[in-house]
A protein has these predicted regions:
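Extended, solvent-exposed segments with strong compositional bias
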Residues: 131-135, 139-153
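A short, solvent-exposed loop/turn motif at the edges and junctions
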Residues: 146-173, 178-189
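Beta-strand-rich domain onsets/edges
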Residues: 16-117, 203-206, 220-223, 231
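Single conserved hydrophobic/aromatic residue that forms the stacking wall/gate
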Residues: 1-8, 12, 221-230
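Short, acidic Ser/Thr/Gly-rich low-complexity loop/linker segments typical of extracellular
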Residues: 113-139
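Compositionally biased low-complexity segments at domain edges in trafficked proteins
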Residues: 208-220
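Residue-level preference for beta-strand/loop junctions
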Residues: 2-4, 83-84, 126, 171
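Short beta-strand edge segments in extracellular beta-sheet folds
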Residues: 192-196
Length: 231
C-alpha cells in the first residue's frame, strides 16, 4: 500500500537500484529477501521440520554452481589463511541409516568475512568451496578454516535500508551446506559456530538452535579422529 505518489516513486527507485546492483556474482534481490525475513519465512513454510531430520535455512546470495569436486579429507582453504578446522559428519536418513553417495556442497566466507566471488583479485577462485561424496558409511570429512562472523554487503540499497532502520548487518559465523542424494529431498542448511557473536540477532534470520555446533580443539586431522569424536 502506498499512501502517496512520492512513496511509490521511492519504492520504484529503490527496487531499480537493487536490480542494478545485481550481476553474475552478486544477487542483491536475494539479499533483500534475506534481510526482510522473506527467505526465512518461505523456508519455514516449505520445509517444516521432520522428526530426526536436519533443519533447513536460507541459501544466501553467494552460492556458486559447479563447485569443484573434492577427495575425502581434502582442504578447501586454498590460501592458507585463517584458523585451521577439521569438519566431519555423517549423512543418514530419518531412521539413522547411512546414505552412501550423498553429495555435500559446502562454502564459507574467509577469515576477513568475504566470499571468494567478492574478492576475485584477493582470493583464489573457488576458495573455501567444494563438493564431497559420502562413503559407504555415510561419513564425510574435510579441512577448512573456522568460520567467523561477518557483515553482509552494505554498499548497495540493502545496506542503506539496514542502516536506515537502525539494524546491524552482521551474520554469526557459519558454514553453508547443500546435501543431496538420489531419492531424497535436498537440504539447504548452515552449521553455526557455538558462542559466535550475533547468534541471537542474525541479520537474515537464519539461525536455528539445532544448527549450532561446537568447535573443539583437535590435534589430529584424520578420518580416525572423526570416528573417535563421533563415537
Amino acid at each position: 500500500h502506498y499512501s502517496s505518489r512520492r512513496q511509490r516513486q521511492m519504492c520504484i527507485r529503490d527496487r531499480t537500484k537493487t536490480g542494478q546492483k545485481c550481476d553474475d556474482k552478486r544477487q542483491e534481490f536475494i539479499l533483500l529477501s534475506d534481510v526482510l525475513g522473506i527467505s526465512a519465512l518461505v523456508d519455514t513454510i516449505n520445509n517444516r521440520k521432520t522428526l530426526n531430520a536436519t533443519e533447513s535455512t536460507v541459501l544466501g546470495p553467494f552460492h556458486v554452481k559447479n563447485a569443484p569436486k573434492k577427495s575425502m579429507g581434502e582442504n578447501i582453504n586454498q590460501d592458507g589463511k585463517g584458523e585451521p578446522a577439521f569438519i566431519f559428519g555423517k549423512v543418514t536418513d530419518t531412521e539413522g541409516n547411512p546414505i552412501k553417495g550423498a553429495e555435500i556442497d559446502v562454502w564459507q566466507a574467509n577469515e576477513d568475512g568475504f566470499y571468494d566471488i567478492q574478492q576475485p583479485d584477493v582470493q583464489p577462485e573457488m576458495n573455501l568451496r567444494g563438493v564431497f561424496t559420502t562413503e559407504e558409511n555415510g561419513k564425510y570429512w574435510f579441512k577448512s578454516v573456522k568460520p567467523k562472523f561477518y557483515s553482509i554487503p552494505t554498499d548497495g540499497p540493502v545496506g542503506t535500508m539496514i542502516f536506515a532502520t537502525g539494524r546491524h548487518p552482521n551474520r554469526p559465523a557459519h558454514l553453508h551446506y547443500i546435501v543431496s542424494a538420489p531419492g531424497y529431498k535436498p537440504v539447504v542448511t548452515h552449521v553455526f559456530v557455538k558462542g559466535s557473536e550475533y547468534l541471537d540477532s542474525d541479520a537474515v534470520f537464519g539461525v536455528k538452535d539445532s544448527l549450532i555446533s561446537e568447535y573443539k580443539f583437535c590435534l589430529l586431522y584424520t578420518s580416525d579422529a572423526a570416528d573417535d569424536w563421533s563415537s
